[in-house]
Amino acid sequence: MPDTKKTFNSISRVYNLINNIISLGKHKKWKKRLVLGHAIKGNVLDIATGTGDIVYLIEEYWKESTLYATDPSNKMLEIAIKRNVKENVIFSESYCEDLHFNNSFFDFVTISFGIRNTKSINNALTECKRVMKKGATLKIMEFSKSENIFLSLLTTTYLFLIIPFIGLLFGKFKEYYYLSSSISNFYTPKQFEEILLDSGFKIKEIDTFNLGLVTIYTVTKP
């Protein structure tokens, strides 16, 4: 796996634009789906915050929360901080596997399209659980590997022909080929559910949508 900090620093300036292109603008609706349906009061952490899309949705819908956001890419964080006009979010640079927070600190944790890029998913989940209060919720949104052969073929074609080509147009072929590979190599919803259970979480809901290609996993710390 390449250094994710280096990869995301490299694509930080084109990240939002290319996200809109390759998702056909749908990623904004997906992220809103992650946030809606909750009224959170307390400490909230957005991991792998990137350029801050989830942060701004949380600010809009969870107005009584205290919001923290982390990412390993300092360049992505610079953009997120500039976009944060309310200046009420505590940003910090860290990997998911090494969060700089006390034990049992957060009431709610979110990770949007970031868990697959961790160096160790098991270590990342263990660290998430460490900083969560008992009964706290973790919501992870990630691309899913389809078990439908036809959809799997279409997805593979899109991942390894279309997305890297779009990256190439912006001079970022290597970075977007890696991101396509990380999507292709991720788990089916059932496989990732087992990983979450093995990490000690309690499954609350698994919501798969967009033809089974995106899944939101809602789990709690017992």
Where are these regions (language model features)?
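Core SAM-dependent methyltransferase catalytic element
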Residues: 199-222
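Class I SAM-dependent methyltransferase SAM/SAH-binding core
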Residues: 45-98
